[in-house]
Amino acid sequence: MKNVGFHQRNELGLKNAYKSKNKIYIDNDKMYLAGTSNLQDVWDDLKIPLNLTRFSQRYQDADNLLKENPQVKKIVGHSLSGAVGLELQKQHPNKDFDITTYGAPVVQVGGQKYKRFRKSGDLISGLDDGAITYEGSMNPLKAHSYTGYN
């Protein structure tokens, strides 16, 4: 159970991100990015399969905060923002972020470079074969949650 503290810390950071106005929370060297939370995010969700994540509002906000917070080395994202975290790494190849995603809409067959987690029953992250899958719920909203990874 070496990752119990790991997931609990990420859950707390993501809760703070969901509470913040811009859905981003920075704690020392970690940036936490909340998932889809408003109509703009729903629109931005549609950009992910078109490889246009860098044009989403959450990406723009996170990128600006990264410039103001060069100490950030770890990025934790849920759902939409899991994709945003991966895009931040792609757009900043000179950085080597430690990225963790929960329920991210990632399409990958095999292999895993970053720490990616999903739950069975989560339709949003269903195509991410590279994620570690935990037992989920038949309720897709519960299965898509960033909580309960312990």
Write out the residue ranges for each language-model feature.
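Alpha/beta hydrolase fold serine-hydrolase catalytic domain that processes acyl esters and thioesters
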Residues: M1-K74, Q91-N150
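Gly/Ala-rich beta-loop-alpha elbow adjacent to hydrolase catalytic centers
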Residues: V76-S81, G85
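Short Gly/Thr/Asp-enriched flexible loops that form oxyanion-binding sites at enzyme active sites
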Residues: L88
